[in-house]
Amino acid sequence: MSRADQERGARRPAAGRRAAPENPPRAARAGRGTAVPDARPARTARTARTARTTLRPAVGAAGPRRLARRARRAWDRPLTAYYLLLGGSLLITVLGLVMVFSASQIEALNSGLASTYYFRKQLVAAVLGTLLLLVASRMPIRLHRALAYPTLAASLFLMALVQVPGIGQSVGGNTNWLNFGGPFQLQPSEFGKLALVMWGADLLARKQDKKLLTQWKHMLVPLVPAALLILGLIMLGGDMGTAMIVGAILLGLLWVAGAPTRLFATVIAVGATLTVVAFTSSPHRMDRLRCVGATEPGPGDVCWQGLHGIYALASGGWFGSGLGASMEKWGELPEPHTDFIFAVTGEELGLAGTLSVLALFAALGYAGIRVAGRTEDAFVRYAAGGVTAWIMAQVVINIGAVLGLLPIAGVPLPLFSYGGSALLPAMFAVGLLIAFARDEPAARAALAVRPAGVLQSARRVLAGKRPESTANRARTARTARTARTARKTR
């Protein structure tokens, strides 16, 4: 054995015996009775803090990207449209009730009524509308389709009844109301919008099932003649605003149906021609057209309403003068609780309030487009497109008039302005969208595994059953999906 091997063997510890550390801990060097803490944990903590400080800019740079990914995943979830429609519509309705309460008190007192008269009527309509929304959201699609033809027939009958002398009532220069005695009045043309959406969607869906929509005559007939009949009955009463919305619904249905560009452009040209004729044939409508962008009341104060709507918005500032503190509603601004409630909202809640209202309507529009784009059911696609076109067109016409960008058309802000005749069919239409959003396959699966709510658990307890667990709900959903897949395979 060489001398180097002998030295290595001397340094190697014996078997079963642990080598003593060359640098014993400080506690051992200090003696048995003293305990000096080890400095290595402190150095480790300082090293970790230094590493976090060094990496902090990189984490901050990745933060916006991470938030963007999370937001994208949230928007792509199966129940996004369902919650946007349900939450957005209820928030708009509640905020509308608050603004009707604020904007209508002076108007009611000037009319010799109780200050809360209009608010109480709107509250009753909102409760009934919420019930209609819930009923429509739970109805199966086949029942929606079954109601299409009766709804159209009833709407046409009531709209024709308005034109009978002694029955129809004129409000604001338009003869489009039915008075059923007392404070209860009905505007049948509002239900005509809903009827056109449901009937038009069912008609186009049937034609698509028969492969007939590739022919232009099947795409136009009888949809366009029926829409022209509704438009004619509305224009007999002089309601140009509602006629424009019905035209927007027709264009929305044709667009979703995939009408050729030439056909679509022809329909738009005919509609524009009829609109020009309607404006030029009425001096009152021409006065409203001249008031677009006006800065003075004009002769006879024809632009008074639009001008004071701009004043209300301009005086609101960023956060408004405070709820109930509007000055324009004190007799200066006509119709502050109906057509120009958005102006009062801007004055009392400021730019923040108006942008919030716009954001809620934008959420409804996005959800409607998403439902129409993701479904495989033809009726759902056409009905969702029609309802979305209806609500968005009405929002644009109302807010455009308040901003002075469009002529005043006497159109209320959907789900927001005072008026039960406008609120009830609009909430039923939103209920249709909610039902369509629930009917998506991914949404059904997500709802099946969602934890049971309080009412569902209480119902099971009262029935003598134990509350269903999440695992059981997931198992039930998987079984249902397997059964549907098996049926499709067969």
Protein language model features and the residues they cover:
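Transmembrane alpha-helix interface/packing and boundary motifs in multi-pass membrane proteins
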Residues: 161, 230-238, 315-319, 397, ...
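Cytosolic juxtamembrane amphipathic/interface segments immediately preceding
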Residues: 64-80, 113
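Hydrophobic alpha-helical transmembrane segments of multi-pass inner membrane proteins, especially
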Residues: 86-102, 108-305, 343-401, 428-432, ...
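A juxtamembrane structural motif centered on a specific transmembrane helix
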Residues: 1-67, 71, 399-490
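Transmembrane helix boundary and interhelical junction motifs in multipass membrane proteins
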Residues: 239-244, 320-326, 336-338, 355, ...
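Helix-boundary and loop/linker segments of multi-pass membrane transporters
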Residues: 75-79, 215, 219-220, 330-333, ...
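Active-site-proximal inter-transmembrane loops
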Residues: 174-183, 331, 406-414, 424
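TM-adjacent membrane-interface loops and short helices in multi-pass inner/ER membrane proteins
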Residues: 291, 295-341, 349-353
